[in-house]
From Swiss-Prot:
Pfam families: QVR (PF17064). Disulfide bonds join 41-75, 44-52, 71-93, 108-119, 121-126. It comes from Drosophila simulans (Fruit fly). It comes from the Eukaryota. GO terms for biological process: regulation of circadian sleep/wake cycle, sleep; regulation of synaptic transmission, cholinergic; rhythmic process; sleep. Residues 54-67 are annotated as: Loop 1. Belongs to the quiver family. Consists of a single Ly-6 domain, adopting a three finger fold stabilized by 5 disulfide bonds. The first loop contains a region essential for protein folding or that is required for localization to the cell surface. The second loop mediates protein-protein interactions. Interacts (via loop 2 of the three-fingered Ly-6 domain) with Sh/shaker; this interaction may stabilize both components of the complex and may be required for targeting or retention of Sh/shaker to neural cell projections. Interacts (via loop 2 of the three-fingered Ly-6 domain) with nAChRalpha3 and potentially other nicotinic acetylcholine receptors; this interaction is required for antagonism of nicotinic acetylcholine receptors. The chain crosses the membrane at residues 136-156. Residues 128-158 form a propeptide. This is UPAR/Ly6 domain-containing protein qvr. Bifunctional regulator of neuronal activity in the mushroom body, and possibly other regions of the brain, that acts as a signaling molecule required for homeostatic regulation of sleep under normal conditions and after sleep deprivation. Reduces neuronal excitability by enhancing Sh/shaker K(+) channel activity; possibly by stabilizing Sh/shaker to increase protein levels, accelerating its activation kinetics, slowing C-type inactivation and enhancing recovery from inactivation. Specifically affects the A-type K(+) current. The lineage of its organism: Eukaryota, Metazoa, Ecdysozoa, Arthropoda, Hexapoda. GO terms for molecular function: GPI anchor binding.
Amino acid sequence: MWTQRNAVGNWLLVLTAVIGFLTFIWIPQTSAECQTRSIYCYECDSWTDARCKDPFHYTALPRDQPPLMTCNGCCVKMVRHQRSRYEVVRRMCTSQLQINLFMVDHVCMMESSGNGHMCFCEEDMCNSSKNLHTNGCQLHLIPIAVAVSWLMGQLLSR
């Protein structure tokens, strides 16, 4: 028999499927964009070039900024010993790293000690940012997915 509870449960299943499909389609495209088009990334190390330190002066004249390089990957910003007098900032392209990771735009990885991090981004000169933020689209999907999962759990436990 068709009840209101069945209708709500079916609606939630459809919503979950749509969110899952959009997430499945969107995330691989984000990674693929990073690897298939050239962008410009800053190339510097604050140990040898004070212009690389945070706060980064992205409004300075190009001659007063660290060099840019063409990148066939993602821009990277690495920080070691953050918020200390020994802080070191390095900005580069992923093609210079000897790691093989599935990279998604605006993802940051923290050092286990909590004293540093490495962030990836896919736009021209994006590794000039002091704080790279998680992509807004992903942030909107997470609460929706959690809410749908909770509601489904409530309905199925009855």
